[in-house]
Regions:
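An aromatic- and histidine-rich active-site surface loop
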Residues: 98-116, 131, 139
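Short N-terminal targeting/anchoring amphipathic segment
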Residues: 87-106, 121
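A conserved, positively charged/aromatic
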Residues: 71-72, 121-147
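A short, active-site helix/loop in glycosyltransferases that binds the activated sugar's phosphate group
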Residues: 146-157
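N-terminal strand-loop element at the rim of the active site
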Residues: 6-14, 26-77
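Alpha-helix capping/helix-boundary segments
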Residues: 43-44, 105-106, 155-157
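A short, glycine/small-residue-rich beta-strand->loop->alpha-helix junction that serves as a flexible
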Residues: 7-21, 128-129
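Histidine-centered beta-alpha loop that forms part of the nucleotide-sugar donor binding/catalytic region
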Residues: 9, 60, 102-104, 124-127
Length: 157
């Protein structure tokens, strides 16, 4: 059985949230075990549990505009380092086989790929154009670390 760890940017029930729910709902439970770590509690938590996912909530940082300044960058790096280690511990304890970043705003999968040598699937739901430096940085990270990149439309490519 393959254990997949999904990292997502929230726990609401909008587009990317619904895609994640449907994706996990469609997994063959004899072949795959879905683990999801979300940065906050919300309606998605129970919905995912209803379809058999093992869900944890851990307040890890999501790349947002509030981090796009010198103080924000320092805060993000500090928080990222702290929580990425906790997520890696979870991955080891649950014998995770693969990581699935379910948005461009979640970067913690990179840490798991580098430290635990796990394959990384990166699912892109958004088109980030501005600020261009951030767009270029995220695109570089995806190109460098993702084993596969999935987009929801040709526009995301």
């Amino acid at each position: 059985m393959k254990r997949i760890l999904y990292l997502h940017a929230g726990a609401e029930m909008y587009g990317a949230d619904k895609v994640l729910l449907e994706l996990i709902k469609g997994l063959d439970s004899k072949e795959f075990e879905a683990h999801v770590i979300l940065p906050n509690d919300g309606v998605l938590v129970e919905a995912l549990r209803q379809v058999g996912a093992k869900v944890s909530v851990l307040d890890y940082p999501i790349l947002r505009r509030k981090y796009f300044n010198p103080k924000g960058i320092a805060d993000y790096i500090r928080s990222y380092n702290f929580y990425a280690k906790q997520i890696a511990l979870y991955a080891r304890e649950h014998s995770i086989d693969m990581v699935h970043n379910n948005t461009a705003a979640v970067l913690e999968g990179i840490y798991l790929k580098r430290k635990l040598k796990l394959p990384l699937i990166w699912h892109v739901h958004e088109i980030i154009v501005k600020p261009k430096a951030i767009s270029d940085f995220i695109n570089m990270l995806m190109g460098r670390y993702a084993d596969k990149i999935v987009t929801v439309s040709p526009s995301g490519r």
